[in-house]
């Protein structure tokens, strides 16, 4: 099964990716992991990517696409893969189609974990951190025993700037603007499958599993 996993920050994409790869035994291929492996192995494309990143520049599409092509050509992708973080643009999505065609593969589904914006805001702005112990809490999902106080050292919990509502809202808007053309592209192609992410983790995975079980032999 050849899959792409999509979802805005806070949608629970990482959790579901772990469950999918554990159940179906396909590699979880994230953009970051691909870049790190290519740079560590000092491949030609990896060294090119490193030169751009060291200069603080965006890695050009042709380098990224080449790294993706190399990764999807590896033996562990013979029975499928779960792509995460690629493609990010319609141009990359079109390049991925060419890559898969050259490898005699085809995409099965693009799974989009869909969560209402307000719930994403609640999830992402609820994190609190102890400035001394570094321990992390969540006001809804993992609250401290005493509100606003670290269980470990009694310090007053803080909200990081990255977790403040105005920052989170802007990040979600940027991500949604980037994701929408891809969602439209894959919807028109018939690959897109929206999964309701506004439910328990186990229930989200049940819905994904229901979709995928027809693909597994």
From Swiss-Prot:
UniProt keyword list: ATP-binding, Cytoplasm, Kinase, Nucleotide biosynthesis, Nucleotide-binding, Transferase
Pfam families: ADK, ADK_lid
Region LID, annotated ranges: 126-163
Name this polypeptide is given: Adenylate kinase
Origin organism lineage: Bacteria, Bacillati, Bacillota, Bacilli, Bacillales
The keyword Nucleotide-binding belongs to this UniProt entry's keyword annotation: yes
Top EC class for this record: transferase
Domain characteristics, as noted in the entry: Consists of three domains, a large central CORE domain and two small peripheral domains, NMPbind and LID, which undergo movements during catalysis. The LID domain closes over the site of phosphoryl transfer upon ATP binding. Assembling and dissambling the active center during each catalytic cycle provides an effective means to prevent ATP hydrolysis.
Stated family: Belongs to the adenylate kinase family.
Subunit (UniProt): Monomer.
Subcellular location: Cytoplasm
